[in-house]
From Swiss-Prot:
GO biological process: deoxyribonucleotide biosynthetic process; DNA replication; viral DNA genome replication
Residues annotated for Fe cation 2 binding in this entry: E101, E164, E198, H201
Name the record gives this protein: Ribonucleoside-diphosphate reductase small chain
Induction behaviour: Expressed in the early phase of the viral replicative cycle.
Active site: Y108
Cofactor entry: Fe cation
Cofactor remark from the record: Binds 2 iron ions per subunit.
Its EC number(s): 1.17.4.1
Assigned keywords, A-Z: Deoxyribonucleotide synthesis, DNA replication, Early protein, Iron, Metal-binding, Oxidoreductase, Viral DNA replication
GO MF, one annotated term: metal ion binding
Source lineage: Viruses, Varidnaviria, Bamfordvirae, Nucleocytoviricota, Pokkesviricetes
Length: 327
């Protein structure tokens, strides 16, 4: 049996630490803590309305995916990994990750409510699995590889890394290009926070596979999972570009295809197996962001003294009154 699944019936407390490397991962993740209300999207509303309709349609598809994807990740953590894994330090990491995924899900809901005032259109985005066949297909693929009956723990961890890495990465890239256009500062800030978190989640899955598994999946199985994820991303990107009538400022469909293959080869390296695609990074100017090296934002600078949320809905309206005593 895998070490991660063996319960120590004599251990009731986290201290003394028995797995210091896993504990360090947890503490790093803890240091990234933020909340969905810490980003100001007021300027984004004007930028969004000024954006050409095809470009808006592209980003709506991305939001529709993200709203669904984080909920699936939360479900897997709560119903599978956190019930099965017995190493406390790993459970601490996954507990923190689940909390972060809740923040991400709330953040995407705030983005939709802020940018899209029409309630019917909001509902279409919130119902991504029902309204978008490719999102439903991606969700089914994730659930397939997270099934503990059909897949080993190692296969599920590889699938989890593919979700947190491959399925999310092109969407992070597309949003980050808005920063180069000097628009949508709130959306970009959310993107930087979330992509940094997800990079940590993906890396931790790779760490567990390399350092804790007795039965690491064969390379051909790892490649199968990763290639399936890439094919799904290709299909989603094609769908989103069709909605955008084939044109989005900053990048082409082919560039995103190439980038996700470049990223997947890096994931292969993290999983200690051979690369698959052997392609160059089509976006060398954004390497720092892609490698999840975005600096930790100073929240004392980010938070206004009195935060004003721009969502025109009482259920989503927040005001934070912050002063030095809060810290």
């Amino acid at each position: 049996m895998e070490e991660l699944l063996i319960e120590d019936s004599q251990r009731f407390t986290i201290f003394p630490i028995q797995h210091p490397e896993c504990w360090n991962w947890y503490k790093k993740l803890e240091s990234l803590t933020w909340t969905a209300q810490e980003v100001d999207m007021c300027k984004d509303i004007d930028d969004w309305e000024a954006m050409p309709k095809p470009q808006r349609e592209f980003y709506k598809q991305i939001l529709a995916f993200f709203v669904v994807a984080d909920e699936i990740v939360i479900e897997n953590l709560l119903t599978n990994f956190m019930r099965e894994i017995k190493v406390k330090e790993v459970l601490y990491f996954y507990t923190m990750q689940a909390a972060q995924e809740c923040v991400h899900s709330e953040a995407y809901s705030i983005q939709v409510k802020t940018l899209i005032p029409d309630e019917k259109e909001q509902q279409r985005i919130f119902s991504g699995i029902e309204k978008h066949p490719i999102i439903r297909k991606m969700a089914q693929w994730v659930q397939q590889w997270m099934d503990p009956v059909k897949n080993s723990l190692g296969e599920r961890l590889v699938g989890f890394a593919a979700v947190e890495g491959i399925l999310f990465q092109n969407h992070f890239v597309a949003i980050q290009f808005l920063k180069e256009q000097n628009i949508m500062p709130g959306l970009v800030s959310y993107n930087e926070f979330i992509s940094r978190d997800e990079g940590m989640h993906c890396s931790f899955a790779c760490f567990l596979i390399s350092n804790y598994l007795n039965n690491i999946p064969e390379e051909k199985i790892i490649h199968k999972i990763l290639k399936e994820a890439v094919e799904l991303v290709d299909e989603f990107i094609s769908y989103a570009f069709d909605k955008a009538r084939g044109s989005v400022p900053g990048f082409s469909k082919e560039m995103l295809f190439q980038y996700i293959r470049y990223f997947t080869d890096n994931l292969c390296f993290m999983l200690q197996c051979k690369s698959i695609y052997k392609v160059e990074n089509p976006f060398p100017q954004m390497t720092k962001f892609f490698l999840n090296e975005v600096e930790k934002t100073n929240f004392f600078e980010l938070r206004p003294t009195q935060y004003q949320n721009c969502v025109k809905d009482d259920a989503f309206a927040f005001k934070l009154f912050l002063n030095d005593d809060d810290f």
